[in-house]
């Protein structure tokens, strides 16, 4: 039998303190009935003697301290799961938002998931083709990896996220591929963009969307990625799917954490964020991966906007410690009209070596990748030198590198948001650009690959 309390002592922001409680547990789901009969929900955030601090999901407006009834439900926040969720749009708490029927769950699960035994993890080693050359060719995404996108305000990360969700696939595999898309604190226009893009291209049939809008309660943002990841775990480990989880915008998630932390009067950490921000982010990012003996996998692409384009800000800084690399969007490239504006030099995929090569992409992938990186870096240096000393001061080799850098940005990195390049097309495009440089400069590529791909039409 559920106990009902009418002992609300205090309400501060999204938090409510109830006293005189017994047998209440941490993270327990709470039902709050207002004097008007309206039902709201929350979860137990902290317990001290006979007091329980409750985090409210739908906000605290209109709560009367004397008349409000509180019921502790004896279970954590759960989400109903089913394969029928594919092709549907839900709000940030997992309720249908597309006008369709409620999901009849095959099972219900705690949104916090269960810790994965490190020994049970399988090492990521299979290539995922996103259709984006700057990622596939130079910062390869591997099945089971977590690879964030570091963006800035006003940069087209939403378009890139939609493009990856639309185009991503595992090559040479008959396994089903699904996308779980979690949006936190986005505007109505952004939400419409994602829904219309997925619907128009037909990719919504393999996608589950969770939408927490900017005018939804900030506290709901803390639950949204956990609900999305619980759904991904169900599809991956119970249904054997390869699941790509895209979470945007993690900055809004961290802001919601900061809001709750401030309401709890906790001692702030760097820039006002709670001291446990690193630990909290890890509970999301570490839910990516593969499990031995299970055919499915979870690959994560969290997207965050860096305040003031600052890579040292706590959110990108701590994210970089947990994840396996980063894809960085450049405002300079964006101003040049390079789309997507991926800055390949500071970007990194720490697991790229595991997902490329013979039988995965192509034998020449690693060598051409290293040569493209080296050529682009030297080309940028040559262009900087030309700005200071003038083009006449450049040697013929430097001019070739400067020409290569321009062509690399315009033809390789820039492809628009509707072009889906296969890995073969990406690698052949790399060889085409390398022909701009003298053969003597291609020191990072083995001779047999130069003979096979540079001197023949196979590399075109």
Swiss-Prot record:
Q: Where are the transmembrane segments?
A: none
Coiled-coil stretches, from where to where? Answer: none
Q: Which PROSITE patterns match?
A: ATPASE_ALPHA_BETA (PS00152)
What are the cysteine partners in each disulfide bond?
none
Keyword line: ATP synthesis, Hydrogen ion transport, Ion transport, Transport
Return the CDD domains for the record: ATP-synt_V_A-type_beta_C, ATP-synt_V_A-type_beta_N, V_A-ATPase_B
Q: Which GO terms describe its molecular function?
A: ATP binding; proton-transporting ATP synthase activity, rotational mechanism
Q: Name one GO biological process term.
A: proton motive force-driven plasma membrane ATP synthesis
Q: What does this protein do?
A: Produces ATP from ADP in the presence of a proton gradient across the membrane. The V-type beta chain is a regulatory subunit.
What does the similarity note say?
A: Belongs to the ATPase alpha/beta chains family.
**NCBIfam families attached to this UniProt entry:** PRK04196.1
Q: What is this protein called?
A: V-type ATP synthase beta chain
Q: Which gene encodes it?
A: atpB
């Amino acid at each position: 039998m559920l106990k009902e309390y009418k002992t609300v002592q205090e309400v501060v922001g999204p938090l409510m303190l109830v006293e005189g409680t017994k047998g209440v547990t941490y993270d327990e789901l709470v039902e709050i009935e207002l004097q008007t009969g309206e039902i709201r929900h929350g979860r137990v955030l902290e317990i001290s003697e006979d007091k329980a601090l409750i985090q409210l999901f739908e906000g605290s407006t209109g709560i009367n301290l004397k008349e409000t009834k509180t019921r502790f439900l004896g279970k954590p926040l759960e989400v109903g799961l089913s394969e029928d969720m594919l092709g549907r749009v839900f709000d940030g708490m997992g309720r249908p938002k597309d006008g369709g029927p409620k999901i009849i769950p095959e099972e219900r699960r705690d949104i916090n998931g269960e810790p994965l035994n490190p020994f049970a993890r399988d090492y990521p080693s299979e290539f995922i083709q996103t259709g984006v050359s700057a990622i596939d060719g130079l910062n390869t995404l591997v099945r089971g990896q977590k690879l964030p996108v570091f963006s800035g305000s006003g940069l087209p990360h939403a378009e890139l996220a939609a493009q990856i969700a639309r185009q991503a696939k595992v090559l040479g595999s008959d396994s089903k591929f699904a996308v779980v898309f979690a949006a936190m604190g986005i505007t109505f226009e952004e939400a419409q963009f994602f829904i219309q893009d997925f619907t128009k291209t037909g990719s919504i049939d393999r996608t589950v969307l969770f939408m927490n809008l900017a005018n939804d309660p900030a506290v709901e943002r803390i639950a949204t990625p956990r609900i999305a990841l619980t759904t991904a775990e169900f599809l991956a480990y119970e249904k054997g799917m390869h699941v790509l989880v895209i979470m945007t915008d993690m900055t809004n998630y961290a802001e919601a954490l900061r809001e709750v932390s401030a309401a709890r009067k906790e001692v702030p950490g760097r820039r006002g964020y709670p001291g446990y921000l690193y630990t909290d982010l890890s509970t999301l990012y570490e839910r990516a991966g593969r499990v031995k003996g299970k055919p499915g996998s979870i690959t994560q692409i969290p997207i965050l906007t860096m305040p003031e384009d600052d890579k040292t800000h706590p959110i990108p800084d701590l994210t970089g410690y947990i994840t396996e690399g980063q894809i960085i969007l450049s405002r300079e490239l964006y101003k040049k009209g390079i789309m997507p504006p991926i800055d390949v030099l500071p970007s990194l995929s720490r697991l790229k070596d595991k997902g490329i090569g013979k039988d995965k992409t192509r034998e020449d992938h690693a060598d051409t990748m290293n040569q493209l990186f080296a050529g682009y870096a030297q080309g940028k240096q040559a262009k900087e030198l030309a700005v200071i000393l003038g083009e006449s001061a450049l040697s013929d080799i430097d001019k070739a590198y400067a020409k290569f850098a321009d062509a690399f940005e315009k033809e390789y990195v820039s492809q628009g948001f509707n072009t889906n390049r296969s890995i073969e097309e990406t690698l052949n495009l790399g060889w085409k650009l390398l022909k701009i440089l003298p053969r003597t400069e291609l020191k990072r590529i083995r001779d047999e690959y130069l003979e096979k791909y540079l001197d023949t039409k196979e590399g075109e």
